């Protein structure tokens, strides 16, 4: 509400300023130019000055195809209020401006550049196009960054504004989502998971939140690094707490969601994890990502899975912790099919590959490595031993049952064929228990894997239905889940508790709808950049042709999957219609998915965001007091 009011005032002020603002002049600057007649770098034709000569028949074109730009040094900071552009006069020109980004900066290397505008339509040759800019920061340098593979090829640019240092009271976003802006030294594109590229990273929220710091950037992930839309890991120079994230930390991840055309499967799984009451659920927020001025798409800014009081909250080991109770923890590891590609890893006695995440590979001591390998093998021996079902000496002795089984249920509800391909676990200091979690990696979950599609047509659990597993994990889970007669009772109890805590199709479908609305502008930009809605990517079983169809199927899947799980676990769900006898009824969930009210009349609600169901109709409500 406050931000909407501010925008109305800002727009009114901006419209008054336009009458006074004129076209700005400055020193043209840009990437090296190309001479198309020779294919070589040019210092005589297609120069940056050609984009500011008032002649729509001339043009600027860069030698390199991507991450190239042309702009002005204005001499002093100016608040930019309007921008104009015209595409190169040739057969390809109109399309070359689409997804170009207008940026402003106060460093001549543009390391502190922020996006002012993104062009979303083709241009018209021989015609100037204009857009109003709403940004309170004054910038000395302005530039047009051409879209990928376009060589800029711009006929004319014009910037309007007035001299002022401005302030940061309003910084624009491209779609209504927060933005992560990465500028790397010399515009080097991150190219592998090993080499950290010197960077400057800014995170701009929709309510004025702002983070800026030196950082390094590299690729992250495994199979996802092969996609054209790359995933990234950011490491800030100092600990940062961006947006509404709980953790203050240096390391953050940008998940690319290339094969997930809803762009929200991971976020949905995180929400389900919260409904199950997992000790820690990773933070996730949909964001737009800009790399060196180029729009990269809709991503999710997420926690790095690491030891932190607001992430995996265990003691952080020192290299002096080599004996006694200090040697017992904390440890964080990943059962990992790719473990043999890592430095700090082991293969268990029953062929389960494990990557040790904490202590770090360059800090862990021989004593610590031996301790956690021995402890894992002891737990595994209980699972595969003759007394595995014994309440005292069986698998429960060293493996925490509740977190392992909740992790299992989240994997099954989501239909995640990769549940046991990668499993995070941790051990606390002074405790003889291994805890499972957090949940992670759901790009191919929710019926997005051709190997198991359609999941709901199968009679058995998805982990037994052609999914992938690291080493011998499938047999490990079989022994815990199927061979111990007491386990199923425990699974039913945990499922029932989650169902009573708000895990139902009404809430989850309403949550999906609210996310789709929040991400609508961003998803349009994303699929403008990555034209894949009509093609099968990664493990897609079906190409549904539109974002709306992808979201609709996600809701259809979750509705049927909850019904499937109820039947499989023989759980009878009591709906609100069964407990409210009046002709009208309300059910209210809070932002975490917890039912806070159900009854015949709507109560007065405290400030916050709620999902309200009234006689079967669901809406999202914001109470702002």
Residue ranges of model-derived segments:
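Sec-dependent N-terminal signal peptides
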Residues: 4-13
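Disordered, acidic Ser/Thr/Pro-rich linker "stalks" and the adjacent N-terminal cap
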Residues: 20-75, 88-95, 121, 163-167
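Trp- and acidic/polar-enriched beta-sheet ligand-binding modules for extracellular glycan
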Residues: 64-68, 91-164
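A short beta-strand element within beta-rich, extracytoplasmic domains
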Residues: 79-91, 144
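Middle-to-C-terminal accessory/interaction subdomains
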Residues: 177, 188-190, 211-215, 221-223, ...
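Conserved oxyanion/phosphate-binding beta-strand-loop segments in alpha/beta enzyme cores
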Residues: 202-256
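Internal "kinase-insert"/substrate-recognition segments embedded within catalytic cores
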Residues: 235, 240-241, 256-257, 277-282, ...
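C-terminal outer-membrane/trafficking sorting elements
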Residues: 577-625
